Amino acid sequence: MKILNDPIYGFITIRYPIILNLIDHPYFQRLNRIKQLGLSYLVYPGAHHTRFHHAIGAMHLMQNAIDVLKLKEIEISEEEELGALIAILLHDIGHGPFSHALEHTLVKGVSHEDISILLMNKLNEEFEGKLDLSIEIFRNNYKKKFLHQLVSS
């Protein structure tokens, strides 16, 4: 278990070692250099939120949502919880420079979601298949559709 200090949500507890390994991976670390708000920082000097910060915050909110659903006696296994957390952590891993501002300019007909899937598949190989469920949830191929809805909303 590790605790991160997030500028928006404060202390965020990371419960699973694989999530720490994914955060430390170069594919994820590159999100530190990609602005969440595209070119907005040129107009709003305080708009320096990165895709890295966004992904960590989104994962934190997913954990909160899962905790509440479990309190309401919605059945979510530990494997499903981890799968959803990884899916949302990596949901924007395919973003390129300046986020959405240049998305369709750099590679026509390919969205950041398409690139995210490619990178998730590559990470799945490196992590010996441990991202299978996360990819199913991300692609909306898992039986509990609400997990994908949490990722995509």
Task: Give the ranges of each region predicted by the language model.
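Sequence-structural signature of the catalytic-core scaffold of metal-dependent phosphohydrolases
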Residues: M1-K35, L42-L85, G94, F98-S153
